[in-house]
């Protein structure tokens, strides 16, 4: 039995990591929480922050690694919650890999309003991105998703637990399904 791929995305501060952790931890099946930031932070020499000009080639490589890791887990029977900033331009590699491997793929965009996003980001600790201009730019990247606009969840008024519940329901109902 193969697993399912769930790409859980949105701008920094949207709650992706917290929600992905809840979805993966409370799952009824074998489930992996794939933190895509790890694939970027593994680059020790020549790293370019992925939102800066000049990062496109690096980002293409990192997305290929993400897709490979996610599909390998799923082929092994694990559901995979891919937690990261996965814009529209990186949906095709996930879609192609899912189609080729016969996997189910859902694309879920957490998109709180900008004020909520910036507020949540200010409250985050650690070495998370704090540049309001960069966060605003990444928020704008998810502002108009064209044919995938129906894959957006406005989480402005939801806490992490409520958002995780909504994600589970939506994925179960196939609302955000792209493949399968």
Predicted features and spans:
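Walker A (P-loop) ATP-phosphate-binding motif of ABC ATPase nucleotide-binding domains
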Residues: 5
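P-loop (Walker A) phosphate-binding loop of NTP-binding proteins
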Residues: 11
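Conserved substrate/cofactor phosphate-moiety recognition/catalytic segment
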Residues: 18-71
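Small-molecule kinase domains that catalyze NTP-dependent phosphoryl transfer to phosphate-bearing small molecules
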Residues: 123-169, 173-180
